[in-house]
Amino acid sequence: MKFQRKYWGLLSTLGVSSAVALSACAAQARDVYVTSSASDLLKNNSVPMSMFNVSPTSSFFGSKYAGLTTYIATGSNKDDGVNVATQTQEKLVLELATSVKGYKKKDKATSSQKTSTNSSCTTTSSGTSTSGEDDWECIGEIKRQSSSNGQNNQQSKSITEEEKFQEISQKATRYEFAIDTGIKWVDNNGKPVKDASGNDVKLSSKDFERGFEAYILSSELRFNRNGYFIDLMGLDVKKTVGMTKKNGAQVQMKVASSDEKDGEEKTVKITDDAYNPEDYQSTDDSKFNVYLTSPFPFLLSMMSKEFFFPIPHTHPKVKAIKVGKDSPLVYNEKNGSKILDQTKTNFDGIYGGGVNAWRDTWSVGPYYVESFNQSQIVFKRNSEYDTHITPNLPKTREDNEKPIPTMINYFQPGATPEVFYSNYIAGGLSSAEVPYSQQEDARSRFAGTGDLRWVKVQKTAQSAQITYSSRPYVVEGETVKTNSNITETEAKFLYNSESEEALTIRAGINGLINWQNLAIILLPNSGDLNYSIVPFGIFKEKGKNGASVQQKAVSTTEGSDLMNDYYYKIEKEQRLGLIPQREGNYEKNKNVLESATVKINYYSSKATSGQAGAAASAAFAKNNNTSDNTQQNQTSSVEAKSVNVTKHSFVQALKKVGFSGSNPLHFNMKLGNSSLSANGVDYYNAVKQALTELGTADNGEKLIVPEIILGDAQGPTRNEWYIGLSSVLGFSSWSPDYDGVGTWLDAATQLNDQGGGDVITYSSGAHIVRTLLLAASQKDVHSKFTQKIDQQNTASTTSDVTVKKADSSQDSSKSNTEEEKWDDVTSADLFKDDPYVLKNFGDAKAQAAQRSTGSTTSGNGTQASLEFTKKALSLLKFLVDNGILDKEKVKEAIKDPNKYLGKRDKIENGTNKPSKNEDFIGYELKDIYKKAAQLNRFNSIWAEKDTDNAKFLITVVDSYFPVLPVPAAGLNETSPTLLKPWFQFRSAPSGNGTIRDYGFIPENK
């Protein structure tokens, strides 16, 4: 089905009538919390939950559901009437699990010994059917804490503060969760569900196994686009949810075909008709085991995501979530894969699906769905949860507060913040955002009432970025054609994304437009702006006193309390992120900086005689008393070019690509919003004007035609056109998978099995690999790197991954896991003039001195390039050691870099375009990958090992300019919201929804 475009014209959304206001605006009962949203959750009734489980409803309704772990918010948000005084504190805790044990495989020398009697593992846990208990060594145990044991909020710990957390998270490949089987499933009336024998249906490990299976199946059937979690965590699917035999062996079925020998055994897959969803790995209702192929430090955090929540395995419509005879799921086969046919599938036969969504659904969470219709959904507090789970969580509410009994969410598609503000005034809502256009009115109207609360964002909860498409071409039959809504010239611009011209255009848009001036239109209180793929507030820095502190809005001159301040700020400390490095006059009140120059570096490869490589190899061999057996002469080389981007060179780059007044670049900016506030209208009008002005040639030709397109990026009807596969620009809306900088990097570098991505943000993964190859291809580096990876030293593999603690100190339990020092690499000048390498890897004292004089360059270029190169070599070796990249292909690539890197780095009169599917963006590196789809996972793990690792990856991606700058509430933004005085809201700093922890004060309190 083709996406229906939602075009937006000047001031069009201001015409939204008050007719869309709530029909029932009467004052609500004190214990009923009423909110409204512009999202049309039930627009497509056939797929309201999108994934056969509770997602995406949990994205809209916060923590009304429950999982193995959860984030809670303790304390209260308080303000002085203008600014925030105190905010809630966040903790990651066990929720439906009473404890979790981490296990690692015993080595062969000790495998015959009995299970470890580690004092933190109080009992011998029962193994699953996949392996014997004696094969595993218990690392440690974390238990659920109780608020009824006298602990207060300050005494209760987050999982991440537990003594054994670091060791478990770094070493465990099996997590055994003890399930709280005392809690009962309740129906839409809040009553315990009974089985056929009249017994209460209680929570079981099988409910989690079924939840995992439903999520995996929907991913395998290409029904949801979040299946990457399986690769990200490294889930061992067969051991965790696969079918079993009584003897514990993996189920096999006999196959006999022309392609396979008679009697050869084949594992039953989850997409096979023969897969039996009622054959469980979890034989003990109280134990659920999650197996990983290698340690993943963020597994416990990720278990708080809705994709891994339980669904009742005994429910008839849960049993129906399978393929095969009599299944409501209908699929088509294409290229050996099964793809869900959403037209023919009977969603009414699936749990939580169809027009009867949520009808006859069960709950073990803090709220259950009592009723719903097209315009509203009603949640009621689950007394079973409060009886069995709430006492075992840290206390969240004050003594005079109670949990909110009823929550109602209205859907008002297309409504603006101004409409919601009016609804609040009329008494129809319990809370509402205060749009900037109404802030003065709110201050006056609600002075002294207690309704006006001030909020300051602590961490970014979600990125909403406008990106460049990485799918300019598609294959139809045997023919490569431009994708729909993309012209041939636009396809050339997108395809040759590594070219000097494409880089000039992207850098010019980010650096020659005065985005911070525009941001003040949308966020008048601060003008906060983010240029980076990684938003503010992510790094936990180590202060001078050794304490771990969250990033603060402080000056970044030498002597700052932050030793490693990545998010520096200039221009009145209002600009955040990796800011485009530019020179010239900063014209504050101009939206296009016509006299400015943006500094970038362009990297390319070229064929050579190989003499430079031969000389380097010979010198290396002589200095190390060894023959040069590790590297033959290079047959091509890499080079750098400093590029100054001005308005004139920007226009010239557009013309060289082929854009003109009659053939312009259609800059269709897609948004996640289904409506805009008055400030939003003004902001995007100004953005359109700035883009038009920047792209206007001296003769008046307009080479850029901007367009604003509204849409609901979180709704179930999002399709390929909207997320950017068939237009120049796409939209990426994403929330962090866990609490760390690596989570943003794994999202930004996600690839498919062939090395391609959905939007260019994800194609940044290929750009990172390209940069690593550039670094290793330097003439004084390649032979040394080759010798290093040929050595049988793989200490950097994930089996020994060590992640820094919150205070940046290394875990004392680490073994031989030190990162390569690369002391033998003493010369690497490729990046010495790169302004972004200089900014982040140059000498700190030189940076401070040059900043004090107003210079935008900093540090010693030669030293910065060397440090940057060493980081690149460390990551490249890490990826080789962990089987993400093929060692022999990497050696081949740095011997002849032009073979892999020369594909899309030049604009050549329209001839440089793909001739087959294998030539698509990123696919030129496909031979180098062993596991392209896991690149993002290992990028994130490596990033979390050290702040400078993360800084390296961010520098590489941000200087590629894959996303547009975006105004986003940051460290300086304090904004008002409306909330009835008897309610207390709590939002976790990580942005995780904590509606479960909201409270209301009864009238007699």
UniProtKB/Swiss-Prot annotation:
Residues 110-131, 145-156 have a biased composition (Low complexity). A lipid is attached at residue 25 (N-palmitoyl cysteine). It is a lipid-anchor. Disulfide bonds: none annotated. The keyword Cell membrane applies. Residues 786-801 have a biased composition (Polar residues). The keyword Cell membrane applies. A lipid is attached at residue 25 (S-diacylglycerol cysteine). Residues 1-24 form the signal peptide. It is found in: Cell membrane. Pfam families: DUF5396. Residues 105-165, 786-825 are annotated as: Disordered. InterPro entries: DUF5396. Keywords: Cell membrane, Lipoprotein, Membrane, Palmitate, Signal. GO terms for cellular component: plasma membrane. This is Uncharacterized lipoprotein MG321 homolog. It comes from Mycoplasma pneumoniae (strain ATCC 29342 / M129 / Subtype 1) (Mycoplasmoides pneumoniae).
